Regions:
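Generic structural signal for well-ordered alpha-helices
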Residues: 100-101, 133-137, 181
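Conserved SGNH/GDSL esterase-like catalytic core that processes O-acyl groups on lipids
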Residues: 41-131
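Active-site phosphate/pyrophosphate- and oxyanion-stabilizing loops and adjacent acidic/basic residues
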Residues: 64, 138, 182-185
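Proline-centered loop/turn at the N-terminus of a beta-strand
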Residues: 112, 147-148, 194
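N-terminal secretory targeting modules
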Residues: 1-50, 54-59, 64, 68-73, ...
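A cross-domain feature marking catalytic cores of carbohydrate-active enzymes
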Residues: 117, 151-154
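Hydrophobic, well-structured mid-protein blocks that either form specific transmembrane helices
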Residues: 125-145
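Catalytic His-Asp segment of secreted/periplasmic serine-dependent ester chemistry enzymes
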Residues: 156-236
Length: 236
């Protein structure tokens, strides 16, 4: 059943990606493209996804849409809502690294993509993030020694006009959280991760567009498709 579902998702997403070659990048002047590490990327290699609810929300999910756009069928998602780089809640370990500690070493993995985490890490200091990002990097390299590692944080900078109290609250919340975004870019650079900035900004939008569900920051299917198309554009 899982195989049939993936085949269906792949067919639907490939159709979507051919018709939508990330128009948002063109609008925002993204002709200046980040260089893709061609020696690492391979459609034949396995993909691993680590992330929070950005990687689990919706059907098809963001990992399914990304791999569909890339024509990749061999992937595994370890995403789970509420997780982050450094997050611990009481005695509960909700760090990304905890999701792969028991995973077997897999040299067939060529690409690891980390999605989100910034809102769940909001109570942790920069030094806590640094310590845990370093541990995450060491663990990924031990488990998947042939992989390149990418990090995306889907952008919440939306031009909401008016709106409900819920949306206004989400807007204030996201501004506070995204003040920490430079930390993630810096720590990715320190650990050899590739922060896909243009992909992370795929949801910048005009007031007439709507890429989010009711909570104001999780992408709806259109938003997820836009992010997936941005990833495909990066690798094209």
């Amino acid at each position: 059943m899982k195989i049939l579902k993936r085949i269906w998702v792949l067919a639907a997403v490939m159709l979507l990606c051919t018709s939508q070659v990330y128009a948002g990048t063109a609008k925002s002047g993204a002709g200046k493209k980040e260089a893709a590490p061609e020696t690492q990327y391979s459609k034949d290699g396995k993909w691993i996804f680590l992330g929070d609810s950005y990687g689990t929300h919706g059907n098809p999910s963001l990992p399914e849409l990304i791999t569909g756009c890339l024509g990749v069928t061999n992937f595994k998602s370890y995403c789970r809502g509420g997780y982050g780089v450094a997050k611990k809640s009481g005695g509960d370990d909700q760090r990304f690294v905890s999701r792969i500690l028991s995973a077997a070493i897999d040299r067939s993995v060529k690409n690891v993509m980390i999605i989100g985490g910034i809102s769940n890490d909001r109570k942790h200091s920069k030094e806590e993030l640094r310590t845990n990002m370093s541990k995450l990097a060491r663990t990924i390299r031990a488990k998947y020694p042939n992989s390149a590692v990418y990090y995306i944080i889907p952008n919440w900078h939306a031009n909401w006009k008016g709106g409900t109290v819920r949306i206004q609250t989400a807007r204030l919340y996201q501004r506070r959280v995204l003040l920490r975004l430079p930390w993630y870019k810096e720590l990715c650079a320190e650990n050899g991760f590739i922060f896909l900035d243009k992909v992370s900004q795929a949801l910048r939008k005009s007031a007439n567009d709507n890429f989010f569900i009711y909570d104001g920051h999780h992408p709806n299917v259109l938003g997820r498709q836009r992010i997936a198309s941005a990833v495909a554009s990066y690798f094209s």
